[in-house]
Amino acid sequence: EIRLSLVGSEMCIRDRYTSYPTADRFTKEFGAEDFKKVLNARGTGENTADLSLYVHIPFCANVCFFCGCNKEVTKDHCRSKEYLEVLSKECELVSAEIGGNKEVVQLHFGGGSPTFLNNEEIFQVMDIIRSHFALAPDAEISIEVDPRSTPVDKVEVLAKAGFNRMSIGAVSYTHLTLPT
């Protein structure tokens, strides 16, 4: 049942903006060698813009029916273990193309729900990043959190791991709109 009284002034049509570049910009004409050239240009100084990284953690413990993001709904942490192994390899390959002379000034974890990761996995993923990339001392290190499954002790773990910003993508602050 749709309760229009809860929707109110939010009833309007908007573009779905969930990534940059948007999905329609990806083509088969841009292949692996093109990607390597772009990464290499980042490391050789041809592109002097600050380096920012986005890490996608696609796992969610529960489905949110309003979400259009790339996600896998699971409670099985064997899936995240496998994913972190592949993420480590990808970081190794990307950092080899970029080289070690660029500092990361911004690191963002999105998803899915990155706080799906257990405490050990949170530290593991940060170790993976730090082993392949130099984080600037004042880097913004942010993570999207699901407030329904992020207790205070998890926030403390995030801070200890180095996160200094949280993004709470609240759809609503009323339990009537977003039941748990």
Set out the residue ranges of the language-model regions.
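Glycine-rich anion/phosphate-binding loops
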Residues: E82-V86, S149-T150
